Design a protein with these regions (language model features):
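Helix-centered, glycine/charged polyanion-binding patches within enzymatic domains
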Residues: 219-328
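Basic, amphipathic alpha-helical segments enriched in Lys/Arg and hydrophobic/aromatic residues
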Residues: 308-377
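Short amphipathic helix-turn modules centered on a small-residue break
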Residues: 13-20
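Short secondary-structure capping/turn micro-motifs that flank functional sites
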Residues: 70, 237-238, 347
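Short, charged amphipathic recognition helices of the HTH superfamily
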Residues: 1-8, 324
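Polybasic low-complexity intrinsically disordered regions
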Residues: 4-7, 17, 25-223, 227, ...
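Arg/Lys-rich, glycine/proline-spaced intrinsically disordered segments
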Residues: 91-99, 234-237, 364-365, 370, ...
């Protein structure tokens, strides 16, 4: 770690809060400060206070939050790949009743003793926000992601998970983890953070890509009183007879019913007859219904308001690009991918400072713009 610029560039030194006559602290002083920050929650507390201040001043009035993750490499040296021992060949045939009971018992014990983030996502629903934040793995690990060409890209490092207001583009919640953590396993901590720590009365929608298509995430969003706008990830599911690819009912001739409205009181989607049914000879024979109603609680993954496939659903889903823009800003302008520290604890300090400075910059710009508008008026 070098501080030659602080000594050589007076303007930079003044911008950093030093006077010309001040001595620049030593490298070890900065190292001790980073260590102290890594062992406390002070940066998390400051980030939260800043967001609450932005809400108080009226700069955050979003109705939609977009959630996504971005990866960045560690400064630590990547370990050599360990060869996994060959698994013992499985015995042919069915297990006896006693063997199966013993196997089920062993599996239950194994799952019970797993770390929280190695369990199923649904197990996070009843866990407190404090424990979710405390138990997250933060050591650098190998991560993998498919690129635009469908090929696997590997990196050794971390992931930053963000929940961003789609219109204000403030980072409402951030979450730091090892590079091998499944994106979906960070969604519930982010959602609980928004629900429990922030007051956003206009918030209605949570939008995410197909990597977050897990039933537990839909349940968490539903518990918050919001709607999930999440791309559907078809997992070897057979086609449902009588419904189209967006799970809207179809008529006798397989034309899709049109989404009409949502009844908030009864949590019901209303679908009306397809336009093709106007001239259909079966329309007046009592074979096809004029109206279909579907409760979203029948299947939270498939039914949301507005309904999947509708113009309104697509327009809300487009807002998800806000979090991708913020991820790009953090890497291009705020040094997110220029990690200067080893170990996960110290890198989390880097991540927290980056997200804090981004939000602080947003708040400063919003205040300046408000002053300029007031002066013009």
């Amino acid at each position: 770690m070098k501080f030659t610029r602080l000594n050589d560039d007076i303007a930079f030194k003044l911008n950093c809060g030093f006077r010309v006559s001040d001595a620049v602290p030593s490298e070890s002083s900065y190292s001790r400060l980073v260590t102290q920050l890594s062992e406390s929650n002070v940066l998390d507390e400051v980030k939260e206070r800043l967001i609450l201040q932005a809400i108080k001043e009226g700069f955050i009035t979003d109705d939609t939050v977009a959630i996504d993750a971005t990866h960045f490499e560690a400064r630590d040296k990547a370990p050599t790949k360990e060869e996994k021992p060959k698994a013992e060949p499985k015995k042919h045939g069915r297990k006896s009743k006693a063997e199966r009971e013993q196997w089920l018992k062993e599996q239950a014990e194994k799952e019970a003793n797993m770390p929280l983030y190695e369990k199923k996502i649904g197990d996070q629903l009843d866990v407190s926000l404090g424990e979710l934040r405390k138990e997250v793995p933060i050591d650098p690990k190998w991560g993998v992601k498919k690129n635009s060409e469908g090929k696997n890209e590997f990196w050794f490092g971390y992931k930053g998970h963000l929940a961003v207001g789609t219109s204000s583009q403030y980072i409402l919640q951030s979450f730091f983890s090892s590079g091998n953590l499944n994106d979906g396993k960070a969604a519930i901590p982010l959602l609980k953070g928004i629900h429990e720590r922030l007051s956003l009365p206009k918030l209605r929608y949570q939008t995410m890509d197909a990597g977050y298509d897990y039933e537990a995430i839909y349940k968490q969003v539903y518990k918050m009183g919001h709607q999930s706008i999440i791309a559907y990830n078809k997992r070897n599911e057979s086609e449902i007879i009588g419904f189209d690819k967006h799970f809207a009912p179809t008529c006798f001739r397989e034309h899709s019913y049109r989404y009409d409205s949502y009844d908030v009181k009864y949590e019901t989607l209303k679908y009306t007859q397809p336009k093709e049914c106007i001239d259909c000879p079966l329309a007046n024979d009592g074979i096809c219904q004029k109206v279909f109603k579907m409760k979203i609680t029948k299947d939270l993954r498939r039914y949301t308001a507005p309904a999947r496939g509708s113009v309104a659903w697509k327009n809300i889903f487009k807002r998800r690009t806000a979090v991708e823009r913020v991820n790009a800003y953090l890497k291009e302008f705020f040094q997110l991918n220029n990690v200067r520290y080893c170990t996960g604890k110290r890198t989390k300090v880097h991540f927290d400072i980056v997200t804090l400075i981004y939000n602080a910059s947003k708040l400063a710009v919003d205040r300046i713009n408000t002053q300029l508008i007031t002066q013009v008026a």
